[in-house]
From Swiss-Prot:
Protein name in UniProt: Type VII secretion system extracellular protein C
Taxonomic lineage: Bacteria, Bacillati, Bacillota, Bacilli, Bacillales
Broad class of where this protein is predominantly found: secreted
Organism: Staphylococcus aureus (strain Mu50 / ATCC 700699)
Family membership: Belongs to the EsxC family.
Role played: Implements its pathogenic function during infection.
Cellular localisation: Secreted
Protein's UniProt keywords contain Secreted: yes
């Protein structure tokens, strides 16, 4: 074996190693991207959990307000003030009902979004690990 043969063999092996290293670097880059996405979805899921807790707290407050609105706490003598009070109370009950329905819809949307974010986080984490 002369020097040229050895040099050719070493260069060939170096090219193989270099190509393999580039493939590994690319794979690391791809998996790192998946991990970043998984982390972002986990953060989103956490933030949605906080928002969901806030919505549930608001729903409880609205439910308490609706219960309070059903109680007659004012006794006004005379027909006109009572009529005005009853109309305003009924309007308030109606608005609280609408608000309660909107809160329930928002709660459902947040729960769905949280579930999707959790699924995506798991999906990207699994892609990064496989």
């Amino acid at each position: 074996m002369n020097f040229n043969d050895i040099e050719t063999m070493v260069k060939s092996k170096f090219k193989d190693i270099k190509k393999h290293a580039e493939e590994i670097a690319h794979e690391i880059e791809v998996r790192s991207g998946y991990l970043r996405k998984a982390e972002q979805y986990k953060r989103l899921e956490f933030n949605l959990s906080i928002a969901l807790d806030d919505v549930e707290s608001t729903a409880k407050d609205v439910q308490t307000a609706k219960s309070s609105a059903n109680k007659d706490s004012v006794s006004v003598k005379g027909k006109a003030p009572n009529t005005l009070y009853i109309e305003k109370r009924n309007l308030m009950k109606q608005k609280l009902e609408m608000l309660g329905e909107d809160i329930d819809k928002n709660k459902e949307s947040l729960q769905k979004a949280k579930g999707i974010a959790g699924e995506k986080a798991s999906e990207y984490f699994n892609k990064a690990m496989n």
